[in-house]
């Protein structure tokens, strides 16, 4: 014993607990991804370096954490006594939940009904009533976190909060992760990767805007943070609360089947009404103009009344493509099967450029047509920059603000833009879907939606569901303060389409019933489970040949073939990206278990002929995706 030496712990981090290991193991199995590849990305890069371990404890001190927020907000704190009756009823329902039992609750509230106030009061009760309790709030996007951070800090000023998302520096994320992992942070607020954070005293989970497609990761581990959150809650025997004004069809289906408990908030606060929806048939609109006469007049009237207007067009840039007026040349990307978008300015470049939004290739706008030499080059279509330019000409005295991925490149820039809107420093806001999510604007009197039809008739079977949700969400930004009812104008060539007809009455239940019937008739989710096998290579023939071999293997080894369908390999809708030709193989089954069994066997078969996920010949890179959003 005299020769024994004291053991020195090299890392200040606690071991990963059993529950988080079980979550990672489930994700690895279900999404058919390596366990290390699943778990390691969730651990901050800073903690992976042994050089940082010695100074780790000092770095992780809570009182020095810039990623731990407790700065009070200027927003009004809503105490339980200040909730309206529907909010108080919803809070009472949540308060009665058994916090040692798994259950999935769904807070179904119209936009502006005060869902956030309800769940903040609920979380405050959980933390107050359960010693050492921690709570996790998941948001779909980084730009939604600053406003909610401030609200939480005002609502629970004495509780430590850790914020986790990819916009933080390595050290900031390491500090916040440490605070969550050691139980020091009571409120953990983050985007999708936060679901894999060890939280030793997790008491409940909230998934806000649960319908949002951003919860599904598209590259690498193709997981759904919402679905993993539900599994985690079940495994840890705690309740989970999903929130949305526009639930996903899968969630709605689960409510109908009695798997989720629904709590309704059917009234907006301040006795506000949802905007009146007016459909403008584009055949009647001014031809050859960027903004129709009807929109011009309505925007001018709204400006004169001193109310803000929001113009929603889900295309950033000046124009989706550049064309030649003399020949058939279009600004196609040489490395992708898409067009290079024209930007009047992009980042630090103040002169016009062409940029591919798929691979990032950027070029100067040519002075003349590369094909025929003619100088008559014309922008096709309209993006946010073009709309902004036109609005400045129509109403020169108005303060116009553009909000898209170009102007809100960082979290700081994004927060500055939204602060200007909240403080009334913008009269007309032009932007993309960034504007439609979770922001509480108080003076929007008019919403204009341009090019909504672009999503309506696409090859994406989820497009009607996505468009309806997007339009309801963007409508919900208007008329929140009460007073005169706001308006929503939508330009469309197809005003009789069910999406627009159900939207006019905000008939969510009717639209969901309509969609479920369509999906059931077409044998689509949620009535079947799907998976995609992706393949990419330099030549499309190699990608298709690889997938054809995968299909042969599945058909040879699948019992009860009638219950499992394997479609022929096809090129992807966007077949070429960054010089790689991409194809896919769709597999679907009524039984999720049967599909999982076949995918596991297929993964084993493909790995035998591959190094990692690249074939041994080096020609094809492949992956398997569960529950794809796009097929």
Where is each model-derived feature located?
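Conserved strand-helix element at the start of the C-terminal RecA-like helicase core
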Residues: 116, 133-149, 299-325, 377-388, ...
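Conserved helicase motor
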Residues: 139-151, 155, 161-175, 190-197, ...
């Amino acid at each position: 014993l005299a020769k024994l030496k004291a053991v020195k712990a090299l890392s200040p981090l606690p071991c990963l607990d059993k529950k988080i290991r079980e979550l990672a193991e489930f994700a690895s199995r279900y999404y058919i991804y390596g366990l290390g590849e699943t778990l390691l990305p969730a651990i901050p890069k800073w903690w992976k370096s042994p050089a940082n371990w010695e100074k780790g404890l000092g770095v992780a001190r809570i009182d020095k954490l810039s990623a731990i927020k407790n700065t009070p907000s200027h927003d009004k704190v809503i105490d339980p006594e200040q909730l309206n009756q529907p909010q108080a009823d919803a809070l009472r329902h949540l308060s009665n939940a058994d916090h040692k039992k798994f259950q999935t609750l769904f807070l179904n509230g119209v936009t502006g009904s005060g869902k956030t106030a309800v769940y903040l009061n609920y979380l405050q009760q959980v933390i107050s009533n359960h010693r050492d309790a921690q709570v996790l709030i998941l948001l779909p996007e980084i730009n939604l976190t600053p406003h909610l951070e401030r609200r939480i800090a005002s609502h629970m000023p004495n509780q430590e909060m850790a914020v986790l998302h990819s916009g933080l520096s390595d050290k900031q994320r390491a500090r916040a992760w440490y605070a969550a992992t050691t139980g020091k942070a009571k409120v953990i607020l983050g985007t999708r990767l936060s679901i894999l954070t060890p939280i030793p005293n997790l008491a409940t989970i909230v998934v806000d805007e649960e319908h949002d497609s951003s919860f599904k990761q598209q590259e690498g581990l193709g997981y759904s943070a919402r679905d993993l959150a539900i599994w985690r809650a079940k495994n840890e025997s705690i309740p989970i609360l999903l929130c949305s004004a526009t639930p996903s069809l899968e969630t709605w289906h689960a409510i109908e089947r009695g798997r989720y408990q629904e709590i309704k908030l059917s009234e907006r606060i301040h006795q506000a009404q949802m905007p009146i929806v007016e459909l403008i048939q584009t055949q009647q609109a001014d031809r050859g103009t960027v903004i129709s006469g009807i929109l011009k007049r309505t925007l001018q009237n709204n400006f004169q009344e001193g109310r803000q207007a929001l113009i929603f067009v889900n295309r950033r840039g000046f124009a989706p493509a550049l064309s030649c007026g003399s020949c058939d040349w279009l600004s196609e990307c040489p490395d992708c099967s898409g067009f290079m978008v024209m930007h009047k300015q992009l980042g630090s470049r103040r002169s016009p450029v062409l940029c591919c939004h798929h691979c990032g290739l950027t070029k100067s706008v040519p002075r003349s047509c590369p094909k025929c030499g003619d100088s008559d080059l014309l922008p096709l279509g309209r993006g946010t920059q073009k709309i902004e330019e036109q609005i400045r000409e129509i109403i020169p005295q108005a303060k116009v603000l553009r909000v898209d991925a170009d102007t809100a490149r960082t979290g700081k820039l994004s927060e500055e833009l939204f602060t200007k809107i909240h403080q009334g420093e913008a009269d007309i806001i032009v932007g993309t879907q960034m504007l439609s999510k979770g922001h509480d604007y108080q003076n929007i009197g008019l919403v204009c939606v341009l090019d909504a039809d672009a999503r309506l008739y696409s090859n994406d079977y989820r497009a009607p569901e996505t468009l309806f949700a997007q339009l309801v969400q963007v409508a919900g930004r208007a008329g929140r303060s009460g007073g005169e009812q706001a308006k929503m104008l939508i330009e469309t060539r197809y005003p009789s389409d069910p999406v627009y007809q159900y939207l006019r009455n905000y008939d969510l239940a009717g639209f969901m019933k309509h969609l479920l019937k369509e999906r059931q008739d077409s044998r689509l989710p949620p009535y079947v489970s799907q998976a995609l096998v992706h393949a990419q290579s330099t030549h499309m023939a190699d990608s298709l040949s690889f997938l054809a071999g995968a299909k042969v293997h599945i058909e040879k080894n699948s019992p009860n073939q009638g219950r499992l369908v394997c479609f022929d390999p096809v090129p992807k809708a966007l077949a070429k990206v960054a010089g790689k030709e991409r194809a896919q193989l769709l597999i679907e089954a009524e039984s999720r278990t049967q599909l999982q069994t076949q995918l596991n066997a297929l993964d084993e078969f493909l790995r035998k002929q591959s190094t990692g996920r690249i074939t041994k010949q080096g020609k094809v890179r492949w992956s398997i995706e569960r529950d794809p959003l796009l097929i």
